[in-house]
Amino acid sequence: MLKKTTWIKLPRNVLVGHDVIGDLAAAIEELYLDGRPLIVTSPTPDQLIGNRVRSQFADPQTVSVDHASFDAVEAVIDTAKATDAGYLIGLGGGKPIDTAKMASDRLGCGFVSVPTAASHDGIVSGRSSIPEGDTRHSVAADPPLAVVADTAVLAEAPWELTTAGCADIISNYTAVKDWQLAHRLQDVEYSEYAGALSQMTAEMLVDNSDAIKQGFEESAWLVAKALVSSGVAMSIAGSSRPASGAEHLISHQLDRLVPDAALHGHQVGVASIVTAYLHTGENGEWEDIRAALADVGAPTTATELGIDEEIFIQAITSAHAIRDRHTILGNGVSEAAAREAAVFTDVC
């Protein structure tokens, strides 16, 4: 007798395109959210389009966060209660969006994502990444009820943020392989639909990497659509598995060893070159991944990340201990094997 159940939580409204920031209020109106919004942002995005957002609502409140942290989450919760906010709008990059997402989950209220940079798939997913000391916590939360991604705004963001978003998506290649490996070896539940969607999203960026250029709004359109698809894949799976495997473990270990050395997306992109080699060997997909990263202008080596090569190799050998998630790293990669993979792929 079948006893399986699944509960998939997805955004109800997703707007991506030119000047859609002006449709934010209309997108929220369809959600029938009560009360006034609390806009969670940071100084730069607030200066950029904060007034365009506030002008669409009656008596909106704003709170600015400088860093994503558990203290920032508590501050947003306190402000939301003090201002009697009915729902939260995360306006900006990863810091305000992750903070608002986690705060809304704690408050039990609605959350709307308004990214100003296409830097990572957290703009759509049901995961918040919150640092604490030398550790970065991936915290489960509900995905946003709506996502409004204005490609004109995204195209004006620093290009390195867009290339980080590209690299984050391209790394889905190896995340899906790790998920499939865990399914075969440890009977981890695998969703064919979520896996296929994540894989297709990575392939879309790899196949179009030479068309993603700085200063073109069409590039922001391609990356934003890919980030939405990746976030939806995670919502379907009910976990971060479609977009997070060994490459993310290596990135998290780098965060511990050399905090704030490079952008998250860039770190997982470079790490995925190595993990693809570990999966498929000398003539595998690592070359396609490396070429696509180079096409968009993302780093492809430890040196380009600003990270010492020996530290990068150390991260490969110790990343398996970050969390209990089976990947190609298994119970640990030897230093010799890590060095061979990193040197053969020109990462080190």
UniProtKB/Swiss-Prot annotation:
Keywords: Cytoplasm, Lipid biosynthesis, Lipid metabolism, Metal-binding, NAD, NADP, Oxidoreductase, Phospholipid biosynthesis, Phospholipid metabolism, Zinc
Subcellular location, record wording: Cytoplasm
E.C. number(s) listed in UniProt: 1.1.1.261
Binding-site positions, Zn(2+): 168, 248, 264
Cofactor(s) the protein needs: Zn(2+)
GO molecular function: glycerol-1-phosphate dehydrogenase (NAD+) activity; glycerol-1-phosphate dehydrogenase (NADP+) activity; metal ion binding
Pathway: Membrane lipid metabolism; glycerophospholipid metabolism
Keyword Metal-binding included in the entry's annotation: yes
GO cellular component, one term: cytoplasm
Function in brief: Catalyzes the NAD(P)H-dependent reduction of dihydroxyacetonephosphate (DHAP or glycerone phosphate) to glycerol 1-phosphate (G1P). The G1P thus generated is used as the glycerophosphate backbone of phospholipids in the cellular membranes of Archaea.
Protein name: Glycerol-1-phosphate dehydrogenase [NAD(P)+]
Organism for this UniProt entry: Haloquadratum walsbyi (strain DSM 16790 / HBSQ001)
Gene name, Swiss-Prot/TrEMBL: egsA
